[in-house]
């Protein structure tokens, strides 16, 4: 499977076209809208989320609630477009109109794509860069992820994302009873944190950063349960599932690090404290005594829960902006200010869920590759049975 997205942050709409979804997948507009609404929530979101009421329009590839096997096209309209029709319109304008146009940007923001993108594409107005590099694009990535999560759900695979850390405040309570309980608790948390006390402190940290005109980042974790053994491959670098997951997580706006299982902590431990001992269980078959490697060995799944974490840096748009240089005058100035969040880590956990779900669903569809959803489900069950009886 693959998908492409199109659209600017303040353009008329965002679009994604998804190719390769098996026929017979049960998917509705409500399934996608539910994920879009989750992305919009979270303590620390900016005023833009008060304007947008993200809902998907399915324009192809689904009939009567089931996928057809043809490309699925999804559209999410931008409510804010009505305020930007002239500034972001596609029709040509005169030189006089361009010189009078408001909201042109010549002062790049440190940490953003503004300056590098302007140099690369030759844009004197850096709005041409920031409109596409904006995290608003993740709206339709979450929509694509919603389709992937439906594939996984119909194969008995569950995905849950939550927040482990914001602004230096760490969740101490992380031993959730079940993935269902993890979902229940985090959906009720304004910061999507399983540890309620830590969640309150995270909210205080976000409020303090906002009051100071600053922003803060954090760490999110995605857990996937029910993936059969052997998804991925050790044969080539580009078929290793952990490499695909790492690339997907790092492709999320502002993400600068990724780890699996105990992650970088493995560098400070002996091998006997890192690797997961193999045991035999009468019901499960081969399993592991621990899950320090996060459900992945040799580029393949082990049957244990997949555990992926991503590090999100603070958002680079600051209401107390850093020093920059005006590209027209070359004079020092403070950077431009765009309406933004003070912390988007809770929402980013939903985006991380989406991209992780996509990569796993894609690997399963590729590995058990047939064009019908029910036949893929049959093949996945055969693999589970084979692993138990091996």
Curated annotation (Swiss-Prot):
Q: Which UniProt keywords apply?
A: Amino-acid biosynthesis, Aromatic amino acid biosynthesis, FAD, Flavoprotein, FMN, Lyase, NADP
So where does NADP(+) get bound?
Answer: 39, 45
Pathway note: Metabolic intermediate biosynthesis; chorismate biosynthesis; chorismate from D-erythrose 4-phosphate and phosphoenolpyruvate: step 7/7
User: What GO MF terms are annotated?
Assistant: chorismate synthase activity; FMN binding
Cofactor(s) needed: FMNH2
Amino-acid positions noted as binding FMN in the UniProt annotation, renumbered to this chain: 132-134, 253-254, 298, 313-317, 339
EC id: 4.2.3.5
The residues forming the signal peptide are none
Q: Where are the transmembrane segments?
A: none
Relate the protein's function as given in its record: This reaction introduces a second double bond into the aromatic ring system.
Subunit organization: Homotetramer.
The protein in question is named: Chorismate synthase
* Source organism: Bacillus licheniformis (strain ATCC 14580 / DSM 13 / JCM 2505 / CCUG 7422 / NBRC 12200 / NCIMB 9375 / NCTC 10341 / NRRL NRS-1264 / Gibson 46)
């Amino acid at each position: 499977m693959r998908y492409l997205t199109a659209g600017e942050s303040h353009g008329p709409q965002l679009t994604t076209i998804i190719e390769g979804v098996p026929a017979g997948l049960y998917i509705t507009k409500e399934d996608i809208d539910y994920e879009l609404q989750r992305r919009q929530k979270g303590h620390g979101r900016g005023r833009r989320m008060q304007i947008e009421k993200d809902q998907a329009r399915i324009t192809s590839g689904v009939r009567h609630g089931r996928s057809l096997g043809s490309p699925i096209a999804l559209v999410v309209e931008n409510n804010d477009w009505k305020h930007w029709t002239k500034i972001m319109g596609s029709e040509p304008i005169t030189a006089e109109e361009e010189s009078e146009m408001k909201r042109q940007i010549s002062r790049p923001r440190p940490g953003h794509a503004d300056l590098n993108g302007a140099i690369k594409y030759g844009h004197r107005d850096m709005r041409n860069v920031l409109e596409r590099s904006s995290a608003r694009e993740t709206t339709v990535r979450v929509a694509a992820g919603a389709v992937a999560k439906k594939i996984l759900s119909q194969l008995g695979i569950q995905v849950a994302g939550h927040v482990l850390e914001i602004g230096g405040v760490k969740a101490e309570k992380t031993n959730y009873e079940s993935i269902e309980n993890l979902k229940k608790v985090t959906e009720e948390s304004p910061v999507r944190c399983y540890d309620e006390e830590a969640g309150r402190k995270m909210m205080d940290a976000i409020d303090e950063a906002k009051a100071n005109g600053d922003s803060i980042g954090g760490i999110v974790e995605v857990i996937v349960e029910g993936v059969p053994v052997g998804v991925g491959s050790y044969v080539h670098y580009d078929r290793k599932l952990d490499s695909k997951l790492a690339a997907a997580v790092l492709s999320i706006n502002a993400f600068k690090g990724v780890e699996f299982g105990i992650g970088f902590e493995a560098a400070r431990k002996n091998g006997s404290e890192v690797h997961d001992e193999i045991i035999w269980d009468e019901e499960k078959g081969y399993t592991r005594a621990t899950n320090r490697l996060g459900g992945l060995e040799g580029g393949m799944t082990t049957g244990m829960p997949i555990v992926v974490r991503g590090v999100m840096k603070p958002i680079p748009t600051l209401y107390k902006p850093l020093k920059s240089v005006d590209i027209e005058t070359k004079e020092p100035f403070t950077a431009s200010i765009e309406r933004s969040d003070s912390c988007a880590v809770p929402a980013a956990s939903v985006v991380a869920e989406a991209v992780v779900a996509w990569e796993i669903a894609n690997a399963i569809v590729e590995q058990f590759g047939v064009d019908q959803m029910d036949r893929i489900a049959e093949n996945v069950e055969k693999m589970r049975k084979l692993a138990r009886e091996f």
